[in-house]
């Protein structure tokens, strides 16, 4: 985590709060926070590694992997229902259109969205899924208002490891390591409830 945050203690706290955000299933609490998250930076700096670690901590069954453009399709959106987090890796460098932006905002505020299981009629659902994405670029939006800026948390990741370890993820997801991660995430969870906001 020191590598990912450049040894910035407040940034480290923020990252654990973001992971803790995925454990919050109370719509009122999630609505009050009203955020989605985009890790941004060029390749080889650990963005994909972080998503792999999150999947290991929260269990793959609790995670989906939709891109932003897929989410506004009610057939894909169905896969978000009941998940703790959506982990969308390597989002394309294209402006977010109005339809996709509406979906991002609705899910981040636990508003009702339309979802549809294959061969079934669509239905409305309010989801508490946390939305976490990675991108090599700052994504623009067609939206002219301020609500996009209020909803998104940009998380820069520009430092690269000096030496690559092929077993890095395995080492960080042992049972002992996962227990350590979980303890720090719980601390972040408590901070979110106590402060009602993320660490600046």
Regions found by a protein language model. Give the residues of each.
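Feature primarily recognizes SF3-like P-loop helicase cores of small DNA viruses
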Residues: 1-200
């Amino acid at each position: 985590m020191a590598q990912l945050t450049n040894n910035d203690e407040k940034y480290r706290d923020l990252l654990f709060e973001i992971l803790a955000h995925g454990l919050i299933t109370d719509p009122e609490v999630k609505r009050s926070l009203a955020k989605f998250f985009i890790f941004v930076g060029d390749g080889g700096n650990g963005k994909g590694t972080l998503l792999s670690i999150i999947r290991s901590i929260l269990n793959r069954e609790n995670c989906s992997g939709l891109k932003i453009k897929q989410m506004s399709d009610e057939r894909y959106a169905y896969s978000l229902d009941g998940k703790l987090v959506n982990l969308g890796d390597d989002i394309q460098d294209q402006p977010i259109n109005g339809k996709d932006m509406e979906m991002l905002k609705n899910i981040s505020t636990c508003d009702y969205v339309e979802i549809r299981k294959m061969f079934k009629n669509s239905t409305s659902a309010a989801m508490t899924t946390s939305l976490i994405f990675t991108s090599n670029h700052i994504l623009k939006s067609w939206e002219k208002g301020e609500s996009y800026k209020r909803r998104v948390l940009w998380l820069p990741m520009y430092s690269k490891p000096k030496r690559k370890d092929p077993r890095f993820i395995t080492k960080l997801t042992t049972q002992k390591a996962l227990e350590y991660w979980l303890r720090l995430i719980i601390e972040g969870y408590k901070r979110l409830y106590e402060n009602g906001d993320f660490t600046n």
